[in-house]
Amino acid sequence: MVERLSAEARASALRDLSGWAELDGREAISRTFTFRDFNEAFGFMTRVALIAEKRDHHPEWRNVYRTVEVVLATHDAGGVTMLDIELARAMDAIAAAISG
């Protein structure tokens, strides 16, 4: 089982993740991605889903038109782990590739 990150480790990791923040009232990180249109948003979700399935680590997310709201936490660990940080980095890279 992966270990939950300390508050200091979470803060350090978040400094390198643009747009990500700790979620109020819960040990999780969140970000809202905004794309040009629904097709880009859905394409982002599809690409992330393939990575998430391969890693067996899935986001909580919500899509409305061109936005995708994401929450990451590792339920088995009761908080944020390196699995979440790594998935956040992958999401950032995918979003950057789509937005060009």
Curated annotation (Swiss-Prot):
Supply the EC number(s).
4.2.1.96
| Coiled-coil segments | none
GO molecular function terms attached to this record: 4-alpha-hydroxytetrahydrobiopterin dehydratase activity
Reaction catalysed by this enzyme:
(4aS,6R)-4a-hydroxy-L-erythro-5,6,7,8-tetrahydrobiopterin = (6R)-L-erythro-6,7-dihydrobiopterin + H2O
Give GO terms for biological process: tetrahydrobiopterin biosynthetic process
**Which controlled-vocabulary keywords does the entry list?**
Lyase
Name the InterPro entries for this protein: PCD_sf, Pterin_deHydtase
PANTHER family cross-referenced by the UniProt entry: PTERIN-4-ALPHA-CARBINOLAMINE DEHYDRATASE
Q: Which family does it belong to?
A: Belongs to the pterin-4-alpha-carbinolamine dehydratase family.
**Protein name stated in the entry:** Putative pterin-4-alpha-carbinolamine dehydratase
